C-alpha cells in the first residue's frame, strides 16, 4: 500500500514530522551525524570506516603543496575518464559532484513542473526543490516499502527514487525503475549506496539512457565525508541542463583526485570485495536484532531499518550508554517506531544493549 502527499511547497512539505520539537524544515535537515559525539559508538552515520584507506590519504596528502593551483581541465577530465571507464560510459556522460547531495541541489535547473519523490527517502531532494519553489509530491511507500510504479503520477516530469533506498535499505528491481520512464520525464536514481551491493545487479549506472540521471556518492564507501565527493551519470543534454546555473570551479583538486582514485580498477575491486564482507556482516546483525524483538525491514544497504516498541525511549537509553542510532521520524513516511542502524562489526554491543533495555522493561 502507498499514498501520495502533496502538492505542497516550502516548509509544508515536512508536516509529516511535526511531532519533533523542531521546525519542520529543521526536522527534514536532521542527519545522523547530529546524534554522534566524541567517544560514542556510532551506528547513526553510514560512512564505511573511521578513516580513508592509507593509500588514498597518501595520494591526497601529496597534493597539499599544490593547493595554490586552480583545478584544471585536465584534472576534471581525469576524474571523468575514471568514472567513465568504471561504468562503460563516455566522458561527456559524467559530471563530478561535491557529493551526491550536490546533484539534488542542482535538480531545480531541470525546471520540472511536477516532481514526484518516492519516500521514505533521503530528504535533500525535497528540500532543494521546495527551496526553488518547485512543487514536490511525495509518493509514500508503506511497509515493506516495495516500489509500486502505478502510484507515481503519470504527469510527473521529474521522478526521484533511491536504490537502495535510504533509510529503508530496500533494493528495487531495475525493471521496476525502468517502468517509471515516460516521454518528457527525467528519472533520477539516487545510487549513493549501490556500490555496497555485491555485483550491483539493480544499478542503472552502466546504462546510457537519455532520460535517466544516476547520482553516485564516494563519500560513504571511501570515508570521505569531510571532503564531499560524488558524480552524476546521464546524457550530455541532461547534464548540461543540470549545470546551467553552477559556480565555476565547483570541485577542488583534492576532490577531483579522489574521484579518479576511487574509480580506478584496483579501488573498485577493493570496494566490491568489501561489499561481499559487509553483506555477510549485515546478515549477522539482522539476525541479532531480530533475536531481541526488532522487526527488521528486508534490504540490501549498509544500514538496517527496524521498528521496536518505544523506539524513542530506546534511542535515548542507547545514547545514555554511549551508543548512537539514527531516529526514523525525520523521514517522510516513517514515524517514531523506527530506528536506523549502520552495519558495524560492533553490532553485538548494540544488540546486547537492546536486550538489557528490554530486560529492564524499557526503563533506563
UniProtKB/Swiss-Prot annotation:
PROSITE patterns the record matches: AA_TRANSFER_CLASS_1
UniProt cross-references to InterPro entries, sorted A to Z: Aminotransferase_I/II_large, NHTrfase_class1_PyrdxlP-BS, PyrdxlP-dep_Trfase, PyrdxlP-dep_Trfase_major, PyrdxlP-dep_Trfase_small
GO MF, any single term: pyridoxal phosphate binding
Species of provenance: Mycobacterium tuberculosis (strain ATCC 25618 / H37Rv)
Cofactor(s) it depends on: pyridoxal 5'-phosphate
Sites of N6-(pyridoxal phosphate)lysine modification: 220
The reaction(s) this protein catalyses: L-histidinol phosphate + 2-oxoglutarate = 3-(imidazol-4-yl)-2-oxopropyl phosphate + L-glutamate
Keyword Nuclease: no
NCBIfam families in alphabetical order: PRK07908.1
Taxonomic superkingdom: Bacteria
Inducers of expression: Up-regulated during macrophage infection.
Keyword Transferase: yes
GO biological process: biosynthetic process
EC numbers: 2.6.1.9
Keywords annotated in UniProt: Aminotransferase, Cell wall, Pyridoxal phosphate, Secreted, Transferase
Subunit structure, as described in the record: Monomer.
GO terms under cellular component: extracellular region
Pfam annotation, one family: Aminotran_1_2
Main location class: secreted
Record's subcellular location: Secreted; Secreted, Cell wall
Protein name: Histidinol-phosphate aminotransferase Rv2231c
Enzyme class: transferase
Alphabetized CDD domains for the sequence: AAT_like
Lineage, opening ranks: Bacteria, Bacillati, Actinomycetota, Actinomycetes, Mycobacteriales
Physiological role: Aminotransferase that catalyzes the conversion of histidinol phosphate and 2-oxoglutarate into L-glutamate and imidazole acetol phosphate. Might play a significant role in mediating histidine biosynthesis during infection. Facilitates mycobacterial survival and virulence in macrophages. Rv2231c is recognized by host TLR4 receptor at the macrophage cell surface to regulate downstream signaling cascades. Inhibits macrophage activation and production of pro-inflammatory cytokines to dampen innate defense. Can inhibit macrophage apoptosis.
Amino acid at each position: 500500500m502507498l499514498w501520495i502527499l502533496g502538492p505542497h511547497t516550502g516548509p509544508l512539505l515536512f508536516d509529516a514530522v511535526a511531532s519533533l520539537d523542531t521546525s519542520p524544515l529543521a526536522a527534514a535537515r536532521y542527519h545522523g551525524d547530529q546524534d554522534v559525539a566524541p567517544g560514542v559508538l556510532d551506528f547513526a552515520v553510514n560512512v564505511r570506516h573511521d578513516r580513508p584507506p592509507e593509500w588514498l590519504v597518501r595520494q591526497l596528502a601529496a597534493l597539499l603543496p599544490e593547493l595554490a593551483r586552480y583545478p584544471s581541465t585536465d584534472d576534471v577530465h581525469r576524474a571523468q575518464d575514471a568514472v567513465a571507464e568504471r561504468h562503460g560510459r563516455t566522458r561527456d556522460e559524467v559530471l563530478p559532484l561535491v557529493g551526491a547531495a550536490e546533484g539534488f541541489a542542482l535538480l531545480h535547473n531541470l525546471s520540472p513542473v511536477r516532481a514526484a519523490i518516492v519516500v521514505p527517502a533521503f530528504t535533500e531532494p525535497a528540500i532543494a526543490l521546495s527551496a526553488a519553489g518547485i512543487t514536490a509530491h511525495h509518493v509514500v511507500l508503506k511497509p515493506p516499502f516495495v516500489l509500486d510504479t502505478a502510484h507515481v503520477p503519470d504527469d510527473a516530469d521529474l521522478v526521484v527514487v533511491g536504490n537502495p533506498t535510504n533509510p529503508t535499505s530496500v533494493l528495487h528491481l531495475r525493471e521496476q525503475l525502468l517502468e517509471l520512464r515516460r516521454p518528457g520525464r527525467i528519472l533520477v536514481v539516487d545510487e549513493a549506496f549501490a556500490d555496497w551491493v555485491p555485483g550491483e545487479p539493480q544499478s542503472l549506472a552502466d546504462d546510457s539512457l537519455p532520460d535517466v540521471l544516476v547520482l553516485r556518492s564516494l563519500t560513504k564507501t571511501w570515508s570521505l565525508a569531510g571532503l564531499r565527493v560524488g558524480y552524476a551519470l546521464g546524457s550530455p543534454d541532461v547534464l548540461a541542463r543540470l549545470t546551467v546555473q553552477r559556480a565555476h570551479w565547483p570541485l577542488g583538486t583534492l576532490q577531483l583526485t579522489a574521484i579518479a582514485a576511487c574509480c580506478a580498477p584496483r579501488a573498485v575491486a577493493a570496494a566490491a570485495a568489501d561489499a561481499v564482507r559487509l553483506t555477510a556482516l549485515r546478515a549477522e546483525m539482522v539476525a541479532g536484532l531480530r533475536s531481541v524483538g526488532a522487526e527488521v525491514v528486508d534490504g540490501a544497504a549498509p544500514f538496517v531499518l527496524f521498528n521496536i516498541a518505544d523506539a524513542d525511549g530506546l534511542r535515548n537509553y542507547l545514547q545514555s550508554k554511549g551508543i548512537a542510532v539514527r531516529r526514523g521520524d525525520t523521514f517522510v513516511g516513517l514515524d517514531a517506531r523506527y530506528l536506523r542502524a549502520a552495519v558495524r562489526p560492533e553490532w553485538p554491543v548494540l544488540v546486547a544493549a537492546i536486550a538489557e533495555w528490554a530486560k529492564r522493561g524499557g526503563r533506563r
